[in-house]
Amino acid sequence: MAKEVVEVLVTGGRATAGPPLGPAIGPLGVNVMQVVKEINEKTKDYEGMQVPVKVIVDTETRKFEIEVGIPPTTALIKKELGIETAAHEPRHEVVGNLTLEQVIKIAKMKKDAMLSYTLKNAVKEVLGTCGSMGVTVEGKDPKEVQKEIDAGVYDEYFKEE
């Protein structure tokens, strides 16, 4: 029972039989349109966001299964802000502001895919991404918020750990 795994990054709810998907799975002998339909169904909640998808094909039976990953942190931040692109000069240009609650929401979505053991550290990882995108948090530079988290200013947000 040989299995082939194809990993691609698709736009949520808008996968097509064209590149990168079609050329990657076509030679494996599965119905490409069926795969595309199932991917679009499973990624519709991530509409417009780049989503990592694994297509696992059993090359003998031609059966397939789809595993949908979590979009990159940058995509989740952009969706939360309702913006298309991050800052071109992140240290000089601000493209949006998130509340700490929004950052915590993103960290909870990504926590399983992160290297962090605690929610507090996952939030600090998301804050680092905010800094590289030109996004402020609570109207402040994300590095400042990270220092405040270390100092215990926001401990009430992390009590459930």
Swiss-Prot record:
InterPro entries: Ribosomal_uL11 (IPR000911), Ribosomal_uL11_C (IPR020783), Ribosomal_uL11_C_sf (IPR036769), Ribosomal_uL11_CS (IPR020785), Ribosomal_uL11_N (IPR020784), Ribosomal_uL11_N_sf (IPR036796). One of its GO terms (molecular function) is large ribosomal subunit rRNA binding. The keyword RNA-binding applies. Pfam families: Ribosomal_L11, Ribosomal_L11_N. PANTHER family: 60S RIBOSOMAL PROTEIN L12, LARGE RIBOSOMAL SUBUNIT PROTEIN UL11M. HAMAP family: Ribosomal_uL11 (MF_00736). Part of the ribosomal stalk of the 50S ribosomal subunit. Interacts with L10 and the large rRNA to form the base of the stalk. L10 forms an elongated spine to which L12 dimers bind in a sequential fashion forming a multimeric L10(L12)X complex. This is Large ribosomal subunit protein uL11.
